[in-house]
């Protein structure tokens, strides 16, 4: 299992990082070992770096998943109201893996607004106390999950 966090600001550095990761995987794991490569690659599925990785013999788990739950892309900038189709966090697998499920987990949490209790509002019964909250993202990236099985080559 390999993980990477690729430089976000320099195109040349991102391209060379992808090539270096692939080279190291070949040197260490060899051509016949099962490989799972995950990471924040800071490029979406339309970028040249993504093409370098997905044309290397590794498969994009999103593309090959039997079932997908991806209501959003993977970057949210800590704002739960942002929506994108871009995935900058990826899971790549070598031949022999079956990608049964793929998901981008968009869970969030709530924090209470100070002094934001409302007593019986609108259609709600009067005794019902409602509290205003702010929805927050726990990270600037949504986690990516894949359920894999290995069947060999």
Language-model-detected regions and their locations in the chain:
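A generic structural signal for short
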Residues: 10, 37-38
């Amino acid at each position: 299992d390999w993980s990477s966090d690729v430089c976000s600001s320099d195109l040349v550095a991102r391209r060379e990082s992808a090539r270096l990761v692939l080279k190291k995987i070949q040197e260490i794991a060899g051509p016949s070992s099962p490989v799972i490569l995950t990471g924040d690659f800071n490029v979406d599925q339309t970028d040249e770096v993504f093409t370098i990785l997905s044309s290397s013999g590794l498969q994009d788990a999103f593309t090959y998943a039997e079932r997908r739950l991806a209501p959003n892309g993977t970057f949210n900038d800590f704002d739960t109201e942002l929506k994108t189709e871009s995935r900058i966090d990826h899971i790549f697998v070598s031949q022999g893996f079956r990608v049964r499920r793929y998901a981008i987990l968009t869970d969030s949490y709530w924090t209470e607004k100070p002094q934001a209790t409302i007593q019986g509002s609108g259609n709600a019964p009067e005794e019902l106390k409602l509290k205003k909250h702010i929805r927050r993202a726990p990270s600037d990236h949504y986690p990516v999950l894949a359920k894999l099985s290995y069947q060999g080559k």
